[in-house]
């Protein structure tokens, strides 16, 4: 009796292409069925690879989800916005640039941010740790924005630098985008314009 060997159409492709196929398949399945409803076997079948290949190329389900989230956490819009904030002497421009940067980051990764992590959040500790890291990085970025506004002596008299971070989180954090764009179905353009105006009113002494 001969054992039929598994043949993968992707076997001759590079490891990078295989990894991308796995992540793309997982992305589609997670959004369609929810994270808990997807198995490694389904991911392998959709990606046209063997189950062991999924584990060796990316890892288990939490690692796959972490890999999908990583581009949102390291989006170049974040570094670009912070560089522009550091170079600006105009408090309004600082907030406008920050609003645009957070808008771009959310818009580019909206299917994951809203479609998966908000509406049907995975419960694994490993995934929560990555999300917590993302939230911490987000706050650190907004802290740099608040520090720049304080350095420009632009904050309202009743707003301390620490409170400025809280207000930036309130106006520019993920929940603002989820509420306006996801739940209330605003366009990203409309949400960005309102968020920037509201943040200026809340934070700046001359608004």
Give the positions of each predicted feature.
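Hydrophobic alpha-helical connector segments
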Residues: 63, 67, 80-108, 165
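Helix-turn-helix
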Residues: 21, 25, 29-63, 67
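N-terminal intrinsically disordered/low-complexity leader segments
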Residues: 1-17, 207
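Short, basic, alpha-helical segments at the C-terminal edge of helix-turn-helix-like DNA-binding modules
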Residues: 40, 69-76
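Amphipathic alpha-helical segments used for helix-helix packing
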Residues: 79-86, 93, 106-132, 143, ...
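Amphipathic alpha-helical packing segments from all-alpha helical-bundle domains
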Residues: 104-115, 126-152, 162-166, 197-204
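Hydrophobic/aromatic-rich alpha-helical bundle segments in the mid-to-C-terminal region
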Residues: 150-198, 207
């Amino acid at each position: 009796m001969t054992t039929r060997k598994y043949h993968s159409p992707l076997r001759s492709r590079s490891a990078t292409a295989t990894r991308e196929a796995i992540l793309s398949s997982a992305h589609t399945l997670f959004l369609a069925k929810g994270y808990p409803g997807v198995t490694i076997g389904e991911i392998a079948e959709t990606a046209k690879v063997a189950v062991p290949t999924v584990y060796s190329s990316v890892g288990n389900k939490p690692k796959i989800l972490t890999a999908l989230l990583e581009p949102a956490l390291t989006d170049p819009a974040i570094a670009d916005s912070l560089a522009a904030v550091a170079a600006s002497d105009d408090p309004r421009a600082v907030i406008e640039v920050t609003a645009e940067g957070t808008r771009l980051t959310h818009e580019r990764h909206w299917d994951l941010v809203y479609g998966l992590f908000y509406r049907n959040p995975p419960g694994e500790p490993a995934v929560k740790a990555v999300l917590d890291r993302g939230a911490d990085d987000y706050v650190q970025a907004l802290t740099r924005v608040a520090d720049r506004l304080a350095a420009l002596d632009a904050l309202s008299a009743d707003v301390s630098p620490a409170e400025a971070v809280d207000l930036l989180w309130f106006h520019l954090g993920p929940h603002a985008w989820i509420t306006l764009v996801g739940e209330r179905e605003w366009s990203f353009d409309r949400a960005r314009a309102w968020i920037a105006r509201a943040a200026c009113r809340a934070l700046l002494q001359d608004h």
